[in-house]
Amino acid sequence: MSHPISVTILTKNSQKHLPACLEALQRFPEVIVLDNGSTDDTMAIATRFPNTRIVEHSFIGFGPLKNLAAQHATHPWILSIDSDEVLSRELADEILQLALSNPQQVYRFLRHNFYGKRHIKACGWDNDWVLRLYHKGTTRFADLPVHEYIQTKGLHVQNLQGTLRHFSFDSIAQLLDKLNQYTTLFAKENRFRKSSSPAKSCLKWAFSLFRNYVLQRGFLYGYEGLAIAFSNANGTFYKYMKLHEENQRLDISLIITTYNWKEALATVLKSAFRQSELPREIIVADDGSREDTRDVIEALAKESPVPVRHCWHPDTGFRLAEIRNKAIAMAGGEYMVMVDGDMVLHPDFLKSHRRMARKDQFIQGKRVLLSSETSQSLMNGQIDKITPFTAGIKNRFNAISSGTLSGLFSARKKDIKAVRGCNMAFWRADVVKVNGFNEDFVGWGREDSEFVIRLLNQGIARRNLKFGGVAYHLYHPENTRNGLNANDAILEKAIEEKSTFCPNGINRHLAANQH
């Protein structure tokens, strides 16, 4: 061995196979055992081997834990082994004789998987090549909670001849324990990244069972093959059902901006109270309204099924960007849905936003334009419900709310055309990443577009929500456009510089809220 190798092992209650695992590694100069909460004899077993060094850490996901173990290693070449795996003598000899002169090289070898003492060559357990030997200065494990892997982009992968024995499971009880753990991790990892449904879960279960038991020859291995095939299929079913369940839960803060139009705000707030899926809170972002607006908010808050918070600052001119930042900074939700105080919400408004939410995306919604007469009737309580056929609607297609149509026609866009903050949704973490709205904007216009430019440049995709997120825009005369030329200049600068961050943004409000 021209270069010493550090072996890393994750353990938790690993006493059964750990002695054989460590026995096969005695010729390696260092073995890092990273334990995350063993309550059996795992630690005592590890201390019996002079080349082992024990590190303890709570569970943070398999990928992050393996990278942490590598950080504790003395040597740059890392051999990552699981505590239920045993190197064959031939594989150990082969690894110890490698020159390891090229850090761009990574090595993999064949793993034989056992159920009890039986070598299983079916159900996807055969032809199992695992990549485990790498230079930690060149690559690392992907930071995934489950199904972690060594990143190999730009690296050369070399196969070794020796084999690794993997004592996967000894009983059906172990299969079920692992199934529950891994399906939960999968669901949390893919929450709002992948879609799922009960129908999809059932179809995937049926195909997985057929593939494992028939196509991958599980039927040749007796009850063990049947148990493994059903375990794999059930794992597929439950990971997608758990994902479906996770995707139903979104912690939404609804932010409503307002300025001195208490009648419209009252109508919007009442529509928020009637949502089929309620937010965790409603925050009124008030750009300096008079005291009568505060009175309306406080009175309606007593009727609200969720907390209503009033975020206000003095009226020193049109400072929409700043009051939005202040409201987002005080929000407790993970997901922000933002509307103007003249946008009356369809009962499924938040539900359709939740259905369309995806990590690394923001949502641009539309608005249904109402006539002056219809707007007044709605505020006076003369109209109880608006449909696409209600009189006084100027763009009726925008009034259609359908989960099926929304999923089919809500497309990604890469531009800032028709960006409107009056109906928009985004992850709070993404807002922080670009430092929120740019408070250099004073006066009406362009603060939404400049915010979106930075999101797009950060790799946050835009998705236009169609046939969902329906909101009815109450008619009013257009705002004055004083200051638009200066705001246009700020927007053009952000476009030219491909801006991803604004200095004058939300960070100071976040810091203030921490005190």
Predicted regions and their residues:
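Short, well-formed alpha-helical segments that are part of the catalytic scaffolds
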Residues: 9-27, 261-274
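Short aromatic/hydrophobic "clamp" motif used to bind/position activated sugar donors
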Residues: 78, 336
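Acidic helix N-cap motif at the loop->helix transition within catalytic regions
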Residues: 17-19, 40-48, 90-91, 266, ...
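A conserved acidic beta->alpha catalytic loop
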Residues: 24, 35-45, 82, 271, ...
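Conserved donor nucleotide-binding strand/loop of the catalytic core
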Residues: 43-72, 294-322, 326, 330
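Catalytic-site signature of metal-activated, phosphate-bearing donor transferases
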Residues: 4, 63-70, 88-246, 321, ...
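Cell-envelope/extracellular polymer assembly enzymes that use nucleotide-activated donors
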Residues: 4-6, 250-253, 281, 450
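Acidic metal-phosphate-binding loop of nucleotide-sugar-dependent transferases
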Residues: 77, 84-87, 343-344
